[in-house]
Amino acid sequence: AHMATEAIWGYGYGAQPGISVFSYNRISSGDFRKKSFVGADRSFDAIAPYTTLTEEEFATIAPYASFKFHAANGEKRNYSTGNVTSIPMMRVEEMYLIEAEATAHYDATTGKSLLQSFMANRDPAYTVPAANDLIDEIIFQKRIEFWGEGVIFYDLKRLNIGMHNGDTGTNAPPMAQLSTDGRAPWWNCVFPLNAVQQNKALAGKNNPNPTQTVKSVK
């Protein structure tokens, strides 16, 4: 329910998880995955074929809100029906993108070809941008493909990719308007205080040092 914008029940009601405006704007207009998100103009006509919400209900939806996840059988009011859904633990698309990235690290030409082949089923007019770093482009397409599925987190850590929620023009809420050079310090789980207090051998060995701070970008 927390990921389904249409769900009108429980704690998830009104949550409206959304995509970064920077990511949304980077998705090509011919990519069908862009239809998973509400545009800046909040056009109901654009999203109507893909939702069970009425135009009146849609009026409360914010720009860039996600419609990628839906309540089961389109049931937006009854949680006992709408919440019953399968959760894929692994998708074959991930394997294609892992192959493309791994190949690109040592053979850019073949890696580019693999990405091009993958994207042909998402945007037939897509071409790998010449100006973009190939690894960055592959990871971006992976971010869009698995948006909201929790897959990309470890890629961001592994490749030391930073956050840009504090950049000019952000649509992130005020408390989340933070930008980092490289991985964010809070992405590592630290030992809880109770564990450190009970086990003196952990003193000074937290992972990472939780005193690092990130300032909000105004």
Listing of model-derived features with the role each one plays in the protein:
Residues 1-218:
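Acidic/polar-rich alpha-helix caps and helix-coil junctions
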